Amino acid sequence: MQNIKVNRGAILRSVEQAHIKQDHPDFQPGDTVRVETKVVEGNRTRNQAFEGVVIAINGTGSRKSFTVRKISFGEGVERVFPFSSPLVAKVTVLERGKVRRAKLYYLRELRGKAARIKSDRSRVMKDAARAQQARDAAQGNSSSETQSSTAAVETQGE
């Protein structure tokens, strides 16, 4: 009888790969996001928004999830959303936060101004540049490409 080693992790990853959603934007703990979830009421469905700060990202693969915290009527409310859930309709990043921790559970004890998170201006600028490139690519001919091509033509003419 021959012993055959089976890599269960590789098999599990290959099965999970089909169920992983890739359409979420990149966000990190400290970012303020709006998560729209599908809610079924009777025979109709609607989207319900939950807006707050991402305080943790847990897991990998299809088991990956993120925790969002908000203050509602003076009470802290936290919800855990699976990345690959079909009930999560859309995730929108509203603000980029600058933090030094991966888990922001300390925010649970802070109140008011102490619970604020600084804005990460460098990531905001990178997002704006990336959005501009996407818009230019969608238009087909970007203004920066036309400017560089006209500058190249001017230097060749001299």
UniProtKB/Swiss-Prot annotation:
Pfam families: Ribosomal_L19 (PF01245)
Gene Ontology terms: cellular component: cytosolic large ribosomal subunit
Statement: the UniProt record of this protein carries the keyword Cytoplasm: no
Composition bias, Low complexity: 130-139
A single GO BP: translation
Ribosomal protein recorded as keyword: yes
Transmembrane feature ranges: none
Gene Ontology molecular function: structural constituent of ribosome
Composition skew (Polar residues), residue ranges: 140-158
Keywords for the protein's UniProt record, in alphabetical order: Ribonucleoprotein, Ribosomal protein
InterPro entries: Ribosomal_bL19, Ribosomal_bL19_CS, Ribosomal_bL19_sf, Translation_prot_SH3-like_sf
Annotated Basic and acidic residues bias: 119-129
Database matches in Gene3D superfamilies: 2.30.30.790
Region (Disordered): 119-158
Family statement: Belongs to the bacterial ribosomal protein bL19 family.
Role of this protein: This protein is located at the 30S-50S ribosomal subunit interface and may play a role in the structure and function of the aminoacyl-tRNA binding site.
Protein known as: Large ribosomal subunit protein bL19
